[in-house]
Curated annotation (Swiss-Prot):
This is Putative uncharacterized protein YJR157W. It comes from Saccharomyces cerevisiae (strain ATCC 204508 / S288c).
């Protein structure tokens, strides 16, 4: 399924290898399995690596759902909260997972090229 998301904000880095966007509540994505996503004319095809920043100062649980392959962040947190990095195929699993964390209600998601990370 393809889907377009209306973002609150987004930006691309000068090197054009990174795009981040902020979306609000994610409940309406609960049962959607997304293969392609269009963000303000920027199309990202899966599988990609997603970097998810939770926009909250409260800490989330330090464990992650077992169906994710977790990779290390090469740099520190950029905004309040924590960063969760996932190598994923279905974005719906990420969104469903985030719904299980009651403290973070808004998210900024950064798409990065797979070559930017090494999977341990």
């Amino acid at each position: 399924m393809d889907i377009s998301i209306q973002c609150i904000s987004y930006h691309t880095s000068l090197s054009k290898d990174r795009c981040s966007f902020e979306i609000g509540y994610l409940e309406y994505f609960y049962y959607i399995s997304i293969t392609n996503i269009t963000i303000l004319n920027l199309k990202v095809e899966y599988p990609k690596i997603l970097e998810i920043h939770t926009i909250t100062s409260q800490l989330l649980p330090k464990y992650s759902p077992p169906w994710f392959d977790i990779i290390k962040a090469p740099y520190g947190n950029k905004i309040p909260g924590i960063v969760m990095l996932f190598k994923c195929i279905s974005i719906s699993r990420i969104l469903v997972s985030l719904l299980h964390y009651p403290y973070a209600r808004r998210y900024a998601i950064v798409f990065v090229p797979s070559s930017s990370y090494s999977v341990n």
